[in-house]
Amino acid sequence: MSEVENSNTVDLQSQLLPLELIEKCIGSRIWIAMKNDKEFVGTLLGFDAYVNIFLKDVTEYEYTPEGLKTVKLDNILLNGNHVCLLVPGGEGPKVKA
């Protein structure tokens, strides 16, 4: 193999697949943006192959015409079909006081 070919070779063992990355986040805080106008920040307790997500100690953020509304929840189960973005360690949107 030439030096050029070798430098373009991808080391697959050092890469994480998406579900592996989510699995590494179990027990950690995660920020989740949904397809609607809601976002959630909580501690990831678990998920399944469909990326249905179970969180605890959750803050829900909803964008309304009046501004950003926040709600505290003990637990929530999110439908994976509506998940748009996952941010490991994310803190959620900045709330103006």
Curated annotation (Swiss-Prot):
Localization recorded for this chain is: Nucleus
Q: Which InterPro entries match?
A: LSm5, LSM_dom_sf, Sm, Sm_dom_euk/arc
Question: Per the UniProt entry, what are the Gene Ontology biological process annotations, in alphabetical order?
Answer: mRNA splicing, via spliceosome
Keywords, comma-separated and alphabetical? mRNA processing, mRNA splicing, Nucleus, Ribonucleoprotein, RNA-binding, Spliceosome
Q: Can you provide one Gene Ontology molecular function annotated for this UniProt record?
A: RNA binding
Q: What Pfam families has UniProt attached to this entry?
A: LSM
What's a single GO CC term here?
spliceosomal complex
The chain positions of domain Sm read 17-92
CDD domains, per the entry: LSm5
Predominant location category: nucleus
Keyword Transmembrane among UniProt keywords: no
Q: How does it assemble?
A: Component of the precatalytic spliceosome (spliceosome B complex). Component of the U4/U6-U5 tri-snRNP complex, a building block of the precatalytic spliceosome (spliceosome B complex). LSM2, LSM3, LSM4, LSM5, LSM6, LSM7 and LSM8 form a heptameric, ring-shaped subcomplex (the LSM2-8 complex) that is part of the U4/U6-U5 tri-snRNP complex and the precatalytic spliceosome.
Q: Can you tell me which family this protein belongs to?
A: Belongs to the snRNP Sm proteins family.
Described function: Plays a role in pre-mRNA splicing as component of the U4/U6-U5 tri-snRNP complex that is involved in spliceosome assembly, and as component of the precatalytic spliceosome (spliceosome B complex). The heptameric LSM2-8 complex binds specifically to the 3'-terminal U-tract of U6 snRNA.
Protein name per UniProt: Probable U6 snRNA-associated Sm-like protein LSm5
Species lineage: Eukaryota, Amoebozoa, Evosea, Eumycetozoa, Dictyostelia
Quote the gene name from the UniProt entry. lsm5
